[in-house]
Amino acid sequence: MTGVLAGRAAIITGANQGLGLAIAQAYLGAGANLFLCARDGGKLAAAVDSLCACAAPKQTILGEAADVSQPADVARVVAHATDALGTVQILVNNAGIYGPLGRIEDIEWSDWLRAIEINLMGSVLMCRAVLPQFRANRYGKIVQLSGGGATNPLPRISAYAASKAAIVRFAETLAEEARDDHIDVNSIAPGPLNTRLLDEVLAAGPERVGESFYTRAAKQKQEGGAPVERGAALAVFLASAASDGITGKVLSAIWDPWETLPSHWNDLNSDVYTLRRVVPKDRGFPWGDR
């Protein structure tokens, strides 16, 4: 088996459709062995079958229905992946939902909390579960999915935006905690994708998501959006040895020259590609300092 991920084992959450499935396909092509999970067991089984049909001899692809917001499910997935694949080197936290669409005072609070549980808490739980073996092996790759909600406000999609921003800051914090054990933790902004989440926005209509956001979503649907392959390719890079030592960053699959990052090693030891507070002097204003 050849490929930049040959011999490595990866757990990918939310891998039964959309970007998660595209990442699984890219990892398969790069030589990885895969353990996939998602809440919809039927779609997951179909995804596993499609991947197995493309697998090289001796490549392993397994799947298991699980809800990453449930600690027992997370423990089971990591235990079964480790039993089946041996040491796991890669975790991709892709599972996520938009949550309720609408003004914060109008939505169902339980739906808002559910989005936080899946998007943020699920990611944290998965990290907690794999970190002991990553630390024991003094190596690991964690890839988070941030989405546009991490870097820009998303009115009427507040649960998604809040959870994705939290994911990025959690990833940056965990990157510092795990740096000495050679565990890299990074986040991907995949760009505007034409996936299930976009269809949910269009189905909700402008009354719930706002006229401006709905208009942009409809245009994106018509024009095709960003290719999922770019996000998947970045996920391969961040799981490979080529990115060793690059950690605590949020990278745009579409706009950032991530393929060239290894040649900018010294510059990466700064706050580039991170979330930071903007102060007046950053915008050239002559006020704001005491």
What positions do the PLM features span?
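Conserved glycine-rich Rossmann-like NAD(P)H-binding loop of the short-chain dehydrogenase/reductase
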Residues: 30-47
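Active-site helix of classical SDR
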Residues: 127, 163
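Active-site-adjacent segment of SDR/Rossmann-fold oxidoreductases
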Residues: 30, 152, 173-183, 242-244
